[in-house]
C-alpha cells in the first residue's frame, strides 16, 4: 500500500513537472503567467458576499460533522475554476435541475494535474486515507 501511495505521489509530481517544463518560453513574460497559461484554466476569486459564496459557506457549515469537534473550519477564499473546453461539455446538461456541490480535498502535489487535466476517479489500489465520504 505504501509503494502504491508513493507511485501515486510520483505521478502527481511528474504531471506538475511536465507542466512547468513545457516548451520554448517567451522570456518577456513573467514565469508565473507562463505557468498559469499552461494550466488552460481560468481561476477567479469569488466575492464572499455573492449568493454563490453564501451557498458554499452554508454547505461548509452544514457538513462539518459533530464528530469533528476538535477544530473549526474557516473558509479563507473561494475560487471559481473554468477549465478550457469544459463549458461545451456541460452545455447540454445546464438546464437539468438535479445539481450537487461536491467537496474535494487533495494534496498540494495533485492540484496542477487536477487543474490541467480535470478531476479523475481514483484507481481501486489508491490509498484510502482521507476519504471521509468514501471513493
From Swiss-Prot:
Substrates-to-products reaction catalysed: NAD(+) + (ADP-D-ribosyl)n-acceptor = nicotinamide + (ADP-D-ribosyl)n+1-acceptor + H(+); L-seryl-[protein] + NAD(+) = O-(ADP-D-ribosyl)-L-seryl-[protein] + nicotinamide + H(+); L-aspartyl-[protein] + NAD(+) = 4-O-(ADP-D-ribosyl)-L-aspartyl-[protein] + nicotinamide; L-glutamyl-[protein] + NAD(+) = 5-O-(ADP-D-ribosyl)-L-glutamyl-[protein] + nicotinamide
GO biological process: ATP generation from poly-ADP-D-ribose; DNA ADP-ribosylation; double-strand break repair; innate immune response; negative regulation of innate immune response; negative regulation of transcription by RNA polymerase II; positive regulation of double-strand break repair via homologous recombination; protein auto-ADP-ribosylation
Localization (cell): Chromosome; Nucleus; Nucleus, Nucleolus; Cytoplasm, Cytosol
Role played: Poly-ADP-ribosyltransferase that mediates poly-ADP-ribosylation of proteins and plays a key role in DNA repair. Mediates glutamate, aspartate, serine, histidine or tyrosine ADP-ribosylation of proteins: the ADP-D-ribosyl group of NAD(+) is transferred to the acceptor carboxyl group of target residues and further ADP-ribosyl groups are transferred to the 2'-position of the terminal adenosine moiety, building up a polymer with an average chain length of 20-30 units. Serine ADP-ribosylation of proteins constitutes the primary form of ADP-ribosylation of proteins in response to DNA damage.
Family: Belongs to the ARTD/PARP family.
Domain remarks: The two PARP-type zinc-fingers (also named Zn1 and Zn2) specifically recognize DNA strand breaks: PARP-type zinc-finger 1 binds PARP-type zinc-finger 2 from a separate parp1 molecule to form a dimeric module that specifically recognizes DNA strand breaks.
Protein name per its UniProtKB record: Poly [ADP-ribose] polymerase 1
Organism: Oncorhynchus masou
Name of the gene encoding the protein in the UniProt record: parp1
Amino acid at each position: 500500500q505504501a509503494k502504491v501511495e508513493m507511485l501515486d505521489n510520483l505521478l502527481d509530481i511528474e504531471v506538475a513537472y511536465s507542466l512547468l517544463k513545457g516548451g520554448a518560453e517567451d522570456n518577456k513574460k513573467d514565469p508565473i503567467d507562463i505557468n498559469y497559461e499552461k494550466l488552460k484554466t481560468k481561476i477567479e476569486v469569488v466575492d464572499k458576499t455573492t449568493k454563490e459564496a453564501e451557498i458554499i459557506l452554508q454547505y461548509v457549515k452544514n457538513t462539518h460533522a459533530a464528530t469533528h469537534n476538535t477544530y473549526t473550519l474557516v473558509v479563507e477564499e473561494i475560487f471559481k475554476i473554468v477549465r478550457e473546453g469544459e463549458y461545451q461539455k456541460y452545455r447540454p446538461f445546464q438546464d437539468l435541475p438535479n445539481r450537487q456541490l461536491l467537496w474535494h480535498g487533495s494534496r498540494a502535489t495533485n492540484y496542477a494535474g487536477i487543474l490541467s487535466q480535470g478531476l479523475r476517479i481514483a484507481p481501486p489500489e489508491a490509498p484510502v486515507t482521507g476519504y471521509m465520504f468514501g471513493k
